[in-house]
UniProtKB/Swiss-Prot annotation:
Binds 1 Mg(2+) ion per subunit. This is Phosphonoacetaldehyde hydrolase. InterPro entries: HAD-like_hydrolase_sf, HAD-like_sf, HAD-SF_hydro_IA, HAD_2, HAD_sf, PGP-like_dom2, Phosphonoacetald_hydro. It comes from Bacillus cereus (strain G9842). GO terms for biological process: DNA repair; organic phosphonate catabolic process. Involved in phosphonate degradation. The active site is at D9 (nucleophile), K50 (schiff-base intermediate with substrate). Homodimer. It is an enzyme of class 3 (hydrolase). Its EC number is 3.11.1.1.
Amino acid sequence: MKIEAVIFDWAGTTVDYGCFAPLEVFMKIFHKRGVEITVEEARKPMGLLKIDHVRALTEMPRIADEWKRVFGQLPTEVDIHEMYEEFEEILFSILPSYATPIEGVKEVIASLRERGIKIGSTTGYTREMMDIVAKEAALQGYKPDFLVTPDDVPAGRPYPWMCYKNAMELDVYPMNHMIKVGDTVSDMKEGRNAGMWTVGVILGSSELGLTEEEVESMDSVELREKIEVVRNRFVENGAHFTIETMQELENIIEHIEKQELIIS
């Protein structure tokens, strides 16, 4: 068994530590309409195509009830599209500031390439959003061999189509010769649905939802508890392995290759 390619998520995995770029924008577009949503609610659908993320928020029972209290009816598709248009406009203006590679990512990518491993990527961002993020990340030294957005396939996560398109472009088959690395539940489902080894990264993830400063200053016992909650969430949603930082990824690769493991 040889791992031939690794498919990475972007925000919260390789760039934008903590995946903060979309968070406040989601909260802002609901606040503007008199509907308050929490940070936890805003994060829950992270990893989905962003219009699907807005739709998922409106379908949460508490948010739907609050919307009905304010407007006298449940959110409509018109409401969802109006909010998404506002979301896009605000997000485009701030994305360049949220494309910095997470510490250690560039070094890990370089090491993987030395092993002959190809680097692909998937995302919940649209192609237009990723044109901004990928360009800025490349200027800072991170550029995967291939990028697929939900715009390029029939549907985004949790469907496996973005992973399949990476496999075709990178010329890697069967799918168990590839690893999917991400920081959200939808990443785990995407990888498993594609028949790939699936790895959840915890520190810097949307699921953990902490800044670097918060991680560094937090009581070690409290931080460990939060890490274990995220680890369990990843495993419950299909992760074969979890890592706290990207630097642990090569150990996972060596384990898979040496043990001749089979995806179950």
